[in-house]
Design a protein with these regions (language model features):
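Rossmann-like NAD(P)H-binding beta-loop-alpha module
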Residues: 195-237
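Beta1/beta-strand and adjacent pyrophosphate-binding region of the FAD-binding site
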Residues: 2-13, 197-207
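Glycine-centered short loops/turns at secondary-structure junctions
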Residues: 27, 221-223, 253
Length: 321
C-alpha cells in the first residue's frame, strides 16, 4: 500500500525545499525525500552557510591586522579552532533547525531515505508515478518526519505515489581528470573540515568557491596561490567584477597564476601537494607546492540513468525549457 502525494521532491537542498514550501503554500500534499541526516543540502550543511561562518572569523582577523591603519593598537594572539568549529556547527544547526521547523509547519512530510523511480516520459501528465524508498546507507529503517526533529521509523521499504516528481538531487565536487581527491588534494567539503588553516594552499579554479577559500585563507595568514585558466577570475561573469576581484586579490597578497592548465598533481600522506601546470605562451611544465591543494573547478550533477528520464552527455536531466 503506497501513500499518495500531489508532489514528491527528491532532494532537500535549496531547490528541493523551496519547491516544497511553495507547493505546500498552494495547497498541494508534498513529500520531501532526503538521504542525509539533515535538510538543507550542500548550501546549508557543507557550502554557503559554513563557509560564511569561517569567512566571518577570518574577516575579523583581517580587520585586527589592519587596525593600526586607523590608529588602533590590536593583535591576534591565536585561533582556538575548537571554538571556531563549534561556532560553525552552531550556525549550521540553527539554520537547519529553522528550515526543518518551517517544513513541518507547512505540513510537508520529510522522509530520510534513498529514492528510486522509473519515469515514463511518454505517459500522460496526469499519470501517477511510484517512488520506491529504502533506508539511507547508515540507517536500518526509513525515517518519516511529520514534526521537526521527531523521526518515526517506517520500515525497510516504502512506496510513494505522486502525480508529479521533482528531481532536486544537487551536485558533487568535480575532480581533476586523472587525479581523484586523495591525500592533500581536497574538495570544498573537506576544506571546511580542516583542523587548522594551512600555512600554504594551492587553489585550482576561479569561481565563487575558489575565491571564497582564497580570500578566507589569505586573511588568516596562509600563502595562497590561485591557478586560473583565463586572464581574470570569474571569467564567465561580468568583466568588471572579475577584473576588480583579480586586482583586489593580488593587492591583498594572493598569488594568481593566469592562463594555467593543470596537468597532474603529486600528493601523499604528509607530503602536501605539488601541482604541475603549463601556461599559455610559455614552454615547459611548471609546478607549485602547497600544504593542501583545493580543487574548485565546478560541480557534477547527481543523476542516475535508471530514473528513466533523458540524461545528456554532461549528466544533466534534459528538459524542454
Amino acid at each position: 500500500m503506497s501513500e499518495q502525494f500531489d508532489l514528491v521532491i527528491i532532494g532537500a537542498g535549496p531547490g528541493g525545499y523551496s519547491t516544497a514550501l511553495r507547493a505546500a503554500e498552494l495547497g498541494m500534499k508534498v513529500a520531501l525525500i532526503e538521504r542525509d541526516a539533515t535538510v538543507g543540502g550542500t548550501c546549508l550543511n557543507r557550502g554557503c552557510i559554513p563557509s560564511k561562518a569561517l569567512i566571518t572569523a577570518t574577516h575579523t582577523i583581517d580587520t585586527v591586522h589592519r587596525a593600526a591603519e586607523l590608529g588602533v593598537n590590536a593583535s591576534v594572539n591565536g585561533i582556538d579552532f575548537g571554538t571556531l568549529r563549534d561556532y560553525r556547527l552552531r550556525v549550521v544547526k540553527t539554520m537547519v533547525g529553522g528550515l526543518a521547523g518551517l517544513l513541518a509547519h507547512r505540513g510537508i512530510t520529510v522522509f530520510r531515505a534513498n529514492a528510486a523511480f522509473h519515469a515514463d516520459e511518454t505517459a500522460p501528465a496526469t499519470s501517477n508515478h511510484i517512488v520506491h524508498l529504502v533506508p539511507s546507507p547508515d540507517q536500518s529503517d526509513i525515517l518519516t518526519y511529520h514534526k521537526a526533529d521527531v523521526p518515526e521509523p517506517s520500515g525497510p521499504t516504502m512506496d510513494l505515489t505522486a502525480t508529479n516528481i521533482v528531481i532536486a538531487t544537487g551536485a558533487k565536487p568535480r575532480p581533476l581528470p586523472g587525479n581523484p581527491f586523495a591525500g592533500a588534494l581536497i574538495d570544498s567539503t573537506q576544506a571546511l573540515e580542516v583542523n587548522e588553516f594551512p600555512s600554504s594552499a594551492v587553489i585550482i579554479g576561479a569561481g565563487a568557491i575558489a575565491l571564497e577559500f582564497a580570500s578566507m585563507w589569505n586573511a588568516a595568514g596562509s600563502k595562497v596561490t590561485l591557478l586560473i585558466r583565463k586572464d581574470r577570475v570569474l571569467s564567465a561573469w561580468d568583466r568588471r567584477a572579475g577584473t576588480t576581484l583579480t586586482r583586489e586579490l593580488k593587492r591583498h597578497g594572493v598569488n594568481i597564476i593566469t592562463r594555467a592548465s593543470v596537468t597532474h598533481v603529486d600528493t601523499g600522506a604528509n607530503l602536501g601537494a605539488t601541482v604541475h601546470y603549463t601556461r599559455e605562451g610559455q614552454d615547459g611544465e611548471q609546478s607549485v607546492w602547497g600544504e593542501i591543494a583545493l580543487v574548485a573547478i565546478g560541480r557534477d550533477p547527481i543523476t542516475d540513468p535508471a530514473w528513466g528520464v533523458t540524461i545528456d552527455d554532461h549528466g544533466h536531466v534534459a528538459t524542454d525549457a
